[in-house]
């Protein structure tokens, strides 16, 4: 599963980490 990449992608867009 690629949850880390997905979360990183969302983090980059929403600026919420």
Curated annotation (Swiss-Prot):
GO terms under biological process: defense response to bacterium; killing of cells of another organism
Tissue occurrence: Expressed by the skin glands.
Main subcellular localisation: secreted
Domain of life assignment: Eukaryota
Any single Gene Ontology cellular-component annotation: extracellular region
Keywords per UniProt: Amphibian defense peptide, Antibiotic, Antimicrobial, Cytolysis, Disulfide bond, Hemolysis, Secreted
S-S bonds: 11-17
Location relative to the cell: Secreted
Sequence similarity: Belongs to the frog skin active peptide (FSAP) family. Brevinin subfamily.
Function: Antibacterial activity against representative Gram-negative and Gram-positive bacteria and exhibits a very high hemolytic activity.
Protein name: Brevinin-1Ta
Species per Swiss-Prot/TrEMBL record: Rana temporaria
């Amino acid at each position: 599963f690629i949850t880390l990449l997905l979360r990183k992608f969302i983090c980059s867009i929403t600026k919420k980490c």
